[in-house]
Structures are given as C-alpha cells and as structure tokens.
Design a protein with these regions (language model features):
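N-terminal targeting signals for export/organelle localization
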Residues: 1-76
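Conserved helix-turn-beta segment immediately C-terminal to the redox Cys motif
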Residues: 98-99, 114-138, 203, 212
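Short, internal strand/loop/helix patches
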Residues: 149-189
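A short beta-strand-turn-helix
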Residues: 69-74, 79-100, 124
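Thiol-/selenol-based redox modules, centered on thioredoxin-like
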Residues: 180-216
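Short active-site neighborhood of thiol/selenol oxidoreductases, capturing the structured segment around
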Residues: 90-113, 119
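Thiol-based oxidoreductase modules, predominantly thioredoxin-like and allied folds used
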Residues: 129-147, 159-169
Length: 216
C-alpha cells in the first residue's frame, strides 16, 4: 500500500470514529431531553407525585360559611377515589358503615403546621375513637411556597395517618366545601356530614367536636 493510500485509509477511519462519537452524543442529548420533558408537572422526583387525579362521586357540598349554620350538616358526603403520593389507591366511601374524619392540609399554611403536632398529640393520647378513619388530604400544592414538596413535608412533620393527594384543580377540597386551612370534615357511619370546622383546633376542643359528631 502506498503512503498516500495509507494516509487516505487513516483519514477515513478518523471520520468514521468521529461520526460514531457525534451520533452517541446526539443520542444522549435526545434521551436527556425526552426524559425531562413531561406534561405532568405535578411530580417532583421518581414515582412520587404531589398531585393525583381525584374522582368525586356525589353532590358537592356548599362552601362552609364564615358564620351561621352549616348547610352541609346532614347531607350525604361525596365519595372520593384517588391515590397517595406514591400512587397507591385510596378511597373515601361514606355510607360504608364507618365514620371518617378528613383533614385538609396545605404544606405552606402556618395554621396547618401548627395543627399537625396537636393531631399527633391527640393520636398518641389514645383519644382517637377506634372505629374512626382519619385521612389527611394534601391540597393547595404550590411549588414556590414553603415546605414543598408536601410528600416530604408530611414525613418531616410525622403525620401518622394515610394521606390522599388532591388533584391540581383541588377536586377533593372543592367537593367538601373547603373554606380555609386546616379544614376538618367528620362523616358519620351513615355517610352524612356531621360537622365541618375550618382553622386550628386545640386537642380538648377536638375531643369534644369528635365525640358530639359521632354521637349525632
């Protein structure tokens, strides 16, 4: 082989190698962009989503008024079908013979942050009725506000009960007539709303509220 042919062959080899390297780099860039382009802006990392779809079955409750009687008391509570932050199925099925207490919380809300320790104290005191199903509902999620993401916030706060992640549109909160945070709704074993409360509640007051609600 002449020197000219050897040089030409060597140049061709370099061109092929460079072409392969460029193709690999392009493929990696495309893969990274594809992995980062998601229409679901509710996820923070991995398989954990800060919002989950919520299906509401039943009439939506009126918003809790600031004062006066609550128009929702005695009405059938809507059923909720949704999921936890990790996608595990969850459901609130009023009328199944079990009483529920739903606690709607927002990670950024100072009143919620003050209330969670009280609820933990309430549980640790042994005052929670054995048949009462307590479910937290994480709603009002905002990535630009304190304590985001809520999936980590509930862990850091030591929340001891299951948590349903509300939808981006806050379907669960709207269905129960949320008017502020934290927001409590107690549903009797008959499936009807017994009481709704908005704002912080001390442990002694909570005991009284729950006892009266479940006795009605």
């Amino acid at each position: 082989m002449s020197k000219q042919q050897a040089k030409k062959s060597s140049n061709n080899g370099r061109v092929v190698i460079i072409g392969v390297v460029v193709a690999i780099v392009v493929a990696l860039i495309v893969a990274v962009l594809a992995g980062g382009d998601s229409s679901d802006d509710d996820t923070s990392s991995g398989d954990v989503a800060q919002n989950q779809p919520v299906l509401v079955d039943g009439a939506m409750l009126e918003r809790l008024p600031d004062d006066g009687s609550d128009p929702a008391v005695g009405m059938a509570a809507p059923a909720l079908t949704g999921a936890s932050f990790d996608g595990s199925p969850m459901a609130v099925t009023p009328g199944d013979g079990k009483p529920y207490m739903l606690v709607f919380l927002a990670h950024w809300c100072p009143h919620c942050n003050a209330e969670v320790p009280r609820l933990i104290e309430w549980k640790e005191s042994g005052a929670v009725p054995a048949d009462l199903i307590v479910i937290g509902v994480s709603t009002g999620v905002a990535s630009d506000r304190p304590n985001y993401p809520p999936s980590q916030w509930v862990v850091d706060k030591g929340w001891p009960w299951p948590v349903m992640a509300d939808s981006v549109n806050m379907d669960a909160a709207a269905a129960y007539g949320l008017s502020g945070y934290p927001f409590f709704t107690i549903v009797g074993a008959d499936g009807n709303v017994k009481v709704r409360v908005s704002g912080e509640v001390e442990v002694d007051a909570l005991n009284e509220i729950v006892s009266e609600a479940l006795a009605s």
